[in-house]
Amino acid sequence: MKELSSAQIRQMWLDFWKSKGHCVEPSANLVPVNDPTLLWINSGVATLKKYFDGSVIPENPRITNAQKSIRTNDIENVGKTARHHTMFEMLGNFSIGDYFRDEAIEWGFELLTSPEWFDFPKDKLYMTYYPDDKDSYNRWIACGVEPSHLVPIEDNFWEIGAGPSGPDTEIFFDRGEDFDPENIGLRLLAEDIENDRYIEIWNIVLSQFNADPAVPRSEYKELPNKNIDTGAGLERLAAVMQGAKTNFETDLFMPIIREVEKLSGKTYDPDGDNMSFKVIADHIRALSFAIGDGALPGNEGRGYVLRRLLRRAVMHGRRLGINETFLYKLVLTVGQIMESYYPEVLEKRDFIEKIVKREEETFARTIDAGSGHLDSLLAQLKAEGKDTLEGKDIFKLYDTYGFPVELTEELAEDAGYKIDHEGFKSAMKEQQDRARAAVVKGGSMGMQNETLAGIVEESRFEYDTYSLESSLSVIIADNERTEAVSEGQALLVFAQTPFYAEMGGQVADTGRIKNDKGDTVAEVVDVQKAPNGQPLHTVNVLASLSVGTNYTLEINKERRLAVEKNHTATHLLHAALHNVIGEHATQAGSLNEEEFLRFDFTHFEAVSNEELRHIEQEVNEQIWNALTITTTETDVETAKEMGAMALFGEKYGKVVRVVQIGNYSVELCGGTHLNNSSEIGLFKIVKEEGIGSGTRRIIAVTGRQAFEAYRNQEDALKEIAATVKAPQLKDAAAKVQALSDSLRDFQKENAELKEKAAAAAAGDVFKDVQEAKGVRFIASQVDVADAGALRTFADNWKQKDYSDVLVLVAAIGEKVNVLVASKTKDVHAGNMIKELAPIVAGRGGGKPDMAMAGGSDASKIAELLAAVAETV
């Protein structure tokens, strides 16, 4: 077996499959594009769904890739085991309706065992297979695999909901009896026992059925096009081929671990407690790649995952004695390790480091807050005479403040308290159940549509015309091809068309189809790309249509021009964002409609009003500069030399279209555009908002809609000016400010009067002092306007020694408000209010010295006041 670096393994994999006629699919962005079922790209096949379900036909049905992936369903185990990771690389080879079982197994065995390639010893390889899949068993035998090395496993059948499914065959490497101390042998595989002896290095999925949850597996129908989907973990292959005990002791992780050794002054012990080193090395890889791909730490979705990974890594750094910010210093090492195939980490190093460091600094402040919260919890336990920290409180520290359980346990035990582990596990399970319930169930490839996939007739989109005559090539009605149609809805393909198919954020054209008499025979309501790329017109049929007949196709010109204004403005906006807030503000999605444009981009904070003003000004400057817009068709490399920006998540063919707006913007784009920027007329941003962690959205309007937006603002300003009696529009702001100042003065004066009235009323309330159990208390119903007045009473009460405890109740509207304040350690206000509040059908809580509650039963106020003597 060859001893190869991880980069050599990756390259050899790709080279082998290229030698078998495969094209190399570049690694896609970790943030999924147009797939709401996935939080992250989590496998090599995740980006190829469109090929497997037949919605798009690839240029080459044989594909290979090395795909960066993230899985976060088992974060707690990362660092504890030899092979758990958050980010990993999946090497794959795929056949879309081309070769199948025989070639997949034979070529896979060749790659693994040939001296020209990986040169694995054959006697170290074991294969599992689905018991009913005799064809795979026989093919392995034909390759020279001993029957004793083939293990039937009932679970070797891959399916996720409806869509492509089939048996799979897995390949394992036997590391020998040294990793099997109990000498269990092949039972480890047959009974699926967790072990370190047999390492799964490759899974070959034979996708041959259309899974249907409504019928038994034996009744699944064969796919019209059978597929191959395989995945081999680079980290596992590297561990095996480099003779490493764990994945972490390979060249993918050890350089990071060595840097952590320098930062911590600690030494990594392969046989000792090395969990913190592993956690840091794993998590900084995931953080570096995810942030580089546009995801940012936050409080939900992907952002929450990244924040959790970073905080977990920071806490493990503290366990190693690293108390300052340090994770950002590891980004360079991650980039250097992966540079040969993933140069983007080094290219975006400054931005990634900035985000990681800023998040570390924020977490440092959070840790201080968490420590304060833990101190309060321990003080409360002491006051209540308890000896155990409850699981729900431990979970809050873990979930809200990022405190690992072991840190909470250590600090609590140092203070002499026990830990409620079972309560913590219960709270954790509740959260996991909620998270699972919230996940969009997905991942299914979707059923293949043989009718659409079978469209092979050529069709060409004509950019520079709004109307043309063309022959009707294909009619599909009720999912069947037909020669003619006279009513209902149908799908049409023409030899050529002026109708733009929805793509790249630009909506489809609409319009009409006319016969040779000039009569409208169909209304075009949508246009989408067929699996083989032809524009597929969805039409409402008004009269007879037949294949082979020529028709006149007319798009809605006014609508197209409105869409083009927004699309061209989107390019200007993208460039302006780069100039004003930074090049990290890359496109994360767009929509160019007739009425507006919507642009999503990566950014770590809200765009300020001043920045929005600069962006809007810059876009309008380019409109007024009347920049010529040109389009050029060329190859990707030439386009990049021209400075063209390749958009987020897009895949480009051999020939690309470059749209250049003067010297201001150059982008790869297949959409339609104006001839000159001046045709946009006017650009106005109407909204900026966050739509998820690290992603902002701008909604803007152009042309007529921009004019309407400005006119509506002017009308509103005129109305305000009239209301405040401003002589001119320019005076309205000053008049509003003057009114605001007057209102503030009145409010201040009113508050002072209320305070004086409350103080006067308090004098009467504070005279009625009672005593019970040696505690002096005041219990009274007061007439106040809001709960804030109760706090004012309490503040006045604290100034003098009226009593030890104060209980105030007020009926405000339909609600009852209760306040308890205490100056004595013998009475805990928070605990006392928990006893009193239920009397008025309420609940509440608070600190030892002050607590408040709300209730709904005002008829029980007297009963509550009478109960005070019993509860002090």
From Swiss-Prot:
Its cofactor is Zn(2+). Binds 1 zinc ion per subunit. It comes from the Bacteria. The keyword Nucleotide-binding applies. Disulfide bonds: none annotated. It holds the Pfam family tRNA_SAD. Its EC number is 6.1.1.7. The keyword ATP-binding applies. GO terms for cellular component: cytosol. Its main location: cytoplasm. It is found in: Cytoplasm. Zn(2+) binds at H567, H571, C669, H673. InterPro entries: aa-tRNA-synth_II/BPL/LPL (IPR045864), Ala-tRNA-lgiase_IIc (IPR002318), Ala-tRNA-ligase_IIc_anticod-bd (IPR018162), Ala-tRNA-synth_IIc_core (IPR018165), Ala-tRNA-synth_IIc_N (IPR018164), Ala-tRNA_ligase (IPR050058), Ala_tRNA_ligase_euk/bac (IPR023033), DHHA1_dom (IPR003156). It catalyses: tRNA(Ala) + L-alanine + ATP = L-alanyl-tRNA(Ala) + AMP + diphosphate. One of its GO terms (biological process) is alanyl-tRNA aminoacylation. Consists of three domains; the N-terminal catalytic domain, the editing domain and the C-terminal C-Ala domain. The editing domain removes incorrectly charged amino acids, while the C-Ala domain, along with tRNA(Ala), serves as a bridge to cooperatively bring together the editing and aminoacylation centers thus stimulating deacylation of misacylated tRNAs. PANTHER family: ALANINE--TRNA LIGASE, CYTOPLASMIC, ALANYL-TRNA SYNTHETASE. Belongs to the class-II aminoacyl-tRNA synthetase family. Catalyzes the attachment of alanine to tRNA(Ala) in a two-step reaction: alanine is first activated by ATP to form Ala-AMP and then transferred to the acceptor end of tRNA(Ala). Also edits incorrectly charged Ser-tRNA(Ala) and Gly-tRNA(Ala) via its editing domain. This is Alanine--tRNA ligase. It comes from Streptococcus pyogenes serotype M2 (strain MGAS10270). The gene is alaS.
